[in-house]
Every structure is written in structure tokens, then in C-alpha cells.
């Protein structure tokens, strides 16, 4: 059974991001909800980024001017998302936006929120607990 029409918006969210602020979600829906290319929450990279070799030595400092850290949720029309995730080559795909990018489509970056943390590493739990207890 078809769950959504091709032009219905789908929000894909990581359960690991348990601190999504309502205003960030509203901003994503407002700014990307009418865009055919969809959009994602993201924050500009604030830390200095280093590229290393396989021995762990610095090869270079990467300019962070145009670097963004992707967050979720990510918003796409159902038809586009289905087409992107049905592609034959999903190697290297780390999120829905990268699958859409493989189609030659450039999703919109919508200002995310630093509080939209991802619980990935053990130390993340400490920070998230502090945030949730405030």
C-alpha cells in the first residue's frame, strides 16, 4: 500500500538526535517544505578541520568557510526520496541528502541548532543529560 503521494513531504529523523528544538524543526518545514530539492538542518563547521594520512599525521588544514555539519531531520518529497533511495549505487551514502545528491540534486541547507546533538559516542550522553536537565 502506498503510504504517501509523490509530492508529500517526508521528514527523516535520527532517533539518536533526541534534543531537536521545535524552532529548528519549524524553520526546516518553512524554508524547505516548498522546495522540490528538499532540505536539511545543518550548522556551519566551527572547529578547525584537519585532513590526515593513514598514520594519523596532518596533511592539511581544510578551510571551513563552506563546510556544514549535517543534522536531522531531513525533508524531501516522497517521490524524490524514493527515487534517491532506490538508486543502484548507494555506496558511500551516509544520509538521505547524500542519496539525493547522487541524483545531481542539491538540497537546501537550513540553519540547524547546536542543541540538536547526536548521541553517538559515550561522552555524548554526558552533554545530552546536562542539556535535558536544564
Mark where each language-model region is.
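Conserved core of the sugar-phosphate nucleotidyltransferase
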Residues: 19-110
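Glycine-rich "substrate-gating" loop/helix at the edge of Rossmann-like oxidoreductase active sites
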Residues: 16, 89, 114-117
Amino acid at each position: 500500500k502506498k503510504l504517501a503521494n509523490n509530492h508529500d513531504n517526508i521528514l527523516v529523523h535520527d532517533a539518536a538526535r533526541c534534543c531537536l528544538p521545535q524552532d529548528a524543526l519549524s524553520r526546516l518545514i518553512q524554508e524547505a517544505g516548498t522546495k522540490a530539492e528538499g532540505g536539511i538542518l545543518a550548522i556551519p563547521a566551527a572547529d578547525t578541520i584537519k585532513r590526515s594520512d593513514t598514520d594519523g599525521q596532518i596533511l592539511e588544514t581544510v578551510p571551513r568557510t563552506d563546510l556544514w555539519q549535517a543534522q536531522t531531520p531531513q525533508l524531501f518529497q516522497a517521490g524524490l526520496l524514493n527515487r534517491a533511495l532506490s538508486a543502484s549505487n548507494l555506496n558511500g551514502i551516509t544520509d538521505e541528502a547524500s542519496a539525493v545528491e547522487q541524483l545531481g540534486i542539491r538540497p537546501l541547507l537550513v540553519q540547524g541548532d547546536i542543541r540538536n546533538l547526536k548521541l553517538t559516542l559515550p561522552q555524548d550522553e554526558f552533554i545530552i543529560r546536562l542539556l535535558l536537565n536544564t
